[in-house]
Amino acid sequence: FDMGGTSTDVAHFDGEYERAFETMVAGVRMRAPMMRIHTVAAGGGSVLHFDGARYRVGPESAGAEPGPACYRRGGPLTVTDANVMVGKIQPEYFPRLFGPGGDEPLNGDVVREQFAALAARIEAETGDKRTPAEVAEGFLRIAVENMANAIKQVSIQRGYDVTEYTLNCFGGAGGQHACLVADALGITRVFVHPFAGVLSAYGMGLADLRVMREHAV
């Protein structure tokens, strides 16, 4: 379970890696062995929307620039901001790397202001009165459901009992949601790697270099 800023990638492991030898990337057929990975547009930078009737998470992403609203660069509300709103991300524990000059802390105040404005808008348009934190929790539930459904596609829908597995979690945003995703699936064990935030890069550095060439005869 690899949750980054733009998307979440999931794969199944049961004693061996599952590989695909032919896949489509941007409409182009690729014939090369690669991990069988299922991807959904749910990441820490996924933009939160209210369309007048329902909440939506993504598929648009704020990316690293401007990034989430809490980055102090004028970005929109995102999944990361929802975690700030509910207290999972506490700005005082993060380095001062944000803002236009890269020397300011995460901005919790702007997150609370924007969620308060969004809660007021939702009440005005629907009559549904919720606190800003409840609005943020609603968006997080949708994001968790999207990620849980992705895991179901590589497990339950293929006949595997996901409750017997350990959820191996990494990626910059994975630890914020791993337990909620596990609860949604009935998984009782979660493993968060010590290098979770940089594990993909770490793995690339340790990977063997392999070249495959094909020639039609």
List each language-model region with its residue ranges.
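N-terminally biased helix-coil "hinge/interface" segments that flank
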Residues: F1-V217
